[in-house]
């Protein structure tokens, strides 16, 4: 494995706008652009690293199975406001699409994330304007992984507006608002835990139901229900063979395309 750290994906080179590239030991590979979770918030500024990033969990599993993983940092509250984190996510995807061929033969481009990263992924997929600003049709992405993302307006976006963050609102800041008929959506993996955070399971079911109601090819929806787990908890555990559970779920989807 080869690790390339702190590559800035905008000309502004703001402290939060960088990515780390984890390359497998092969010349051809699919690429998974991963957007981390955390409620779109960051308590402390990103500190300068004194040691290389530790690669473990799903990232290690994917790289060991021939998938390049790009780990994206982006602006968060309290130093950002809507929609800056979505704009950053789009910039990162555009950088990867333009530059990853410099590192090997790219066989597919997947975009995904967990929790807040799942929300960002949904916004990139369903609201065409964000990737469109970079000349990218979101339907040209090989596949999307929406891991426990909120398809309604994100609770911290509501908080920014001074609205009770428990409310369920679907407006232009909600991925669901942009789901429509007539698009040939790429394959998407949608993941939710049995004991996920309040309302996340129900909102996920509404997203899936809406996609189907609007005529989305159901064979492109890879729904994964994670029994017994809490919100994104499955990323921390290994199976009986010692393999990261989330890594296997991601790889099962990526390897199909």
Language model features with spans:
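Structural cue for short, hydrophobic secondary-structure segments
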Residues: 32-37, 71, 95, 190
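The feature captures the conserved acid-bearing segment of alpha/beta-hydrolase catalytic domains
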Residues: 135-143, 148-161, 166-205, 209
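Primarily recognizes the serine-hydrolase "nucleophile elbow" in alpha/beta-hydrolase
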Residues: 91-159, 171
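Catalytic nucleophile-loop/oxyanion-hole region of alpha/beta-hydrolase
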Residues: 49-54, 58, 68-108, 239-240
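C-terminal catalytic histidine-bearing segment of alpha/beta-hydrolase fold enzymes
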Residues: 205, 213-257
């Amino acid at each position: 494995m080869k690790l390339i750290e702190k590559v800035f994906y905008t000309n502004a080179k703001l402290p939060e706008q960088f990515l780390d590239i984890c390359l497998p030991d092969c010349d051809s590979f699919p690429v998974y652009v991963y957007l981390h979770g955390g409620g779109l918030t960051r308590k402390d500024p990103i500190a300068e690293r004194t040691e290389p990033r530790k690669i473990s969990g799903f990232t290690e599993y994917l790289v060991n199975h021939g998938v390049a993983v790009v780990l994206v940092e982006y602006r968060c509250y309290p130093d950002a406001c809507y929609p800056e984190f979505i704009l950053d996510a789009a910039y990162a995807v555009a950088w990867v699409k333009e530059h990853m061929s410099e590192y090997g033969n790219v066989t597919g481009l997947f975009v995904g994330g967990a929790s807040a990263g799942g929300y960002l992924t949904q916004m990139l997929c369903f609201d065409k304007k964000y990737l469109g600003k970079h000349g990218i049709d979101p339907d040209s992405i090989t596949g999307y992984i929406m891991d426990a993302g909120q398809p309604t307006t994100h609770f911290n976006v509501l908080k920014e507006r001074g609205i009770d963050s428990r409310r369920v609102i679907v407006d232009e800041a909600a991925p669901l608002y942009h789901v429509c008929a007539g698009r040939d959506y790429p394959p998407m993996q949608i993941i939710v835990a049995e004991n996920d955070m309040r309302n996340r399971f129900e909102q996920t079911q509404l997203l899936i139901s809406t996609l189907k109601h609007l005529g989305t090819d159901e064979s492109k929806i890879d729904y994964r229900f994670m029994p017994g787990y809490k919100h994104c908890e499955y990323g921390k555990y290994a199976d009986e063979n010692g393999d990261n559970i989330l890594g296997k779920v991601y790889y099962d989807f990526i390897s199909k395309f």
